[in-house]
Amino acid sequence: MAAQGFLLIASFLLILLVLAKPLGSGLARLIAAVPLPGVAGIERILWRTLGITDHEMNWRQYLLALLTLNLLGLGILFCLLFWQEWLPLNPQRLPGLSWDLALNTAVSFVTNTNWQAYSGESTLSYFSQMAGLTVQNFLSAATGIAVVFALIRAFTRQNVHTLGNAWQDLVRITLWILFPVALIIALFFIQQGVPQNLSAYQPITTLEGAKQLLPMGPVASQEAIKMLGTNGGGFFNANSSHPFENPTALTNLAQMLAIFLIPAALCFAFGEAAGDRRQGRALLWAMSFIFVVCVAVVMWAEVQGNPHLLAAGADSSVNMEGKETRFGVLASSLFAVVTTAASCGAVNAMHDSFTALGGMVPMWLMQIGEVVFGGVGSGLYGMLLFVLLAVFIAGLMIGRTPEYLGKKIDVREMKMTALAILVTPMLVLLGSALAMMTDAGRSAMLNPGPHGFSEVLYAVSSAANNNGSAFAGLSANSPFWNCLLAFCMFVGRFGVIIPVMAIAGSLVSKKVQPASQGTLATHGALFIGLLIGTVLLVGALTFIPALALGPVAEHFSLP
């Protein structure tokens, strides 16, 4: 089993790196605002048609453009969901959503969280899925990538005040990166058996003679961008454990690769844009190390079996509860770590049924900010925040002004870095405390004791860090939970983006200082270790008390 796990991890990372490197080169061209080959003429027509100028924006203008797009999308999506019954492509005649569920769902998909307090096949029409959720899957992913583009330009430019044109970046990211790659993935899914139609649900008779209604819909197209954009919201309630979303072992591998593809490619793009590929590789090494360790821990925990079943005399050599037999325990464990290391949240197994330690690792990966590869764009700018914190700590130890890529890191940058890093832990801890203090919060818990608390902590961690996965033993479709999690999702997304853009605006105007003998090398093994230590230290100090009350207590209470 250990050899199989090693081969699975190694082959996954090898294929990922082979695919990510060429995509990173394309992303680097977009960061430099250089049109991809053969599309310059098309872009000129688009700019004239859409009224987009070549005028570059400062950080406030860039941020305002992104906020305007996202708030407009939030309002439109809310209306689509609330008045769903009056809109077309609703063969099952499904009613509109309640105001609190519509708000929660709209915020969820606009913020790239895709938390779902509903069952897709029994709640949403095809029009809501296509014109509402799928569109936001593209736009929320493009927003995250645009933010990291602006931050990377802040490091690579000097003595200017502009970070690019947000509208041009959003169009280029969507048309030349997200759409073509998602199209290829969708065609592969269709070939593997994922439905793509607008048919009404199909009544069938099973082999046992029972009547059943099979859900249909444009699944493959949404599934592709769901994974590529690290969105994670499933067309069906069972998400990627549903055979219509994830029918084969090949689609399972393709989905995991799609989740990490752009986050890994952005590391290569960062190195190329910075003029030193070692900088991108250093971040990639740090992410990969944490990722491999986490996968190994989850695989080990799940292979141990379920102690409750063993105590009852059942044969439980491995913990297969909540897992699909077509994937097995190792692929399910790998998927769980991939989806929570990134801000995806798609699941091919029920995380609520993992062992205590096996479920704690995905929860912790979310709590540290999902900087291990992370979401498209958000993972890299989140890791760069920890880079700034790491060079600041190193500067304190050696008595030098911290700098990164030749840019001095001053008080303003560190204040914004601290604010961005502290936003999500505050939301998680305060939100969990509020839920446990109120009857409305506790009434949603279907399990008592440490596991019940873990379900609450996981839900708020998932929302605040824009992941979207859940311990399914929480009945979260209530006004209290819909509003609480919507607030956490919105602040967790834009409460980090705003200080990141402020950092970019401050750094872009600074001059690049030449390296000297006292300059900390940020591409070597020493700095990689310092960066990993910084991520682990912040995660440990912030969340160990809460984790001790949940999964740790549950683990030590096992028979």
UniProtKB/Swiss-Prot annotation:
Mode of membrane association: Multi-pass membrane protein
InterPro entries from the UniProt entry: KdpA (IPR004623)
Transmembrane segments: 5-25, 27-47, 63-83, 132-152, 170-190, 253-273, 283-303, 327-347, 356-376, 379-399, 416-436, 484-504, 524-544
Stated role: Part of the high-affinity ATP-driven potassium transport (or Kdp) system, which catalyzes the hydrolysis of ATP coupled with the electrogenic transport of potassium into the cytoplasm. This subunit binds the periplasmic potassium ions and delivers the ions to the membrane domain of KdpB through an intramembrane tunnel.
Main location: membrane
Domain of life: Bacteria
Protein name, UniProt field: Potassium-transporting ATPase potassium-binding subunit
Source species of the chain: Salmonella heidelberg (strain SL476)
Assembly with partners or alone: The system is composed of three essential subunits: KdpA, KdpB and KdpC.
One annotated GO molecular function: potassium ion binding
One Pfam family recorded for the sequence: KdpA
Keyword Cell membrane: yes
Family: Belongs to the KdpA family.
Single GO cellular component term: plasma membrane
Keywords of the record: Cell inner membrane, Cell membrane, Ion transport, Membrane, Potassium, Potassium transport, Transmembrane, Transmembrane helix, Transport
Compartments, as annotated in UniProt: Cell inner membrane
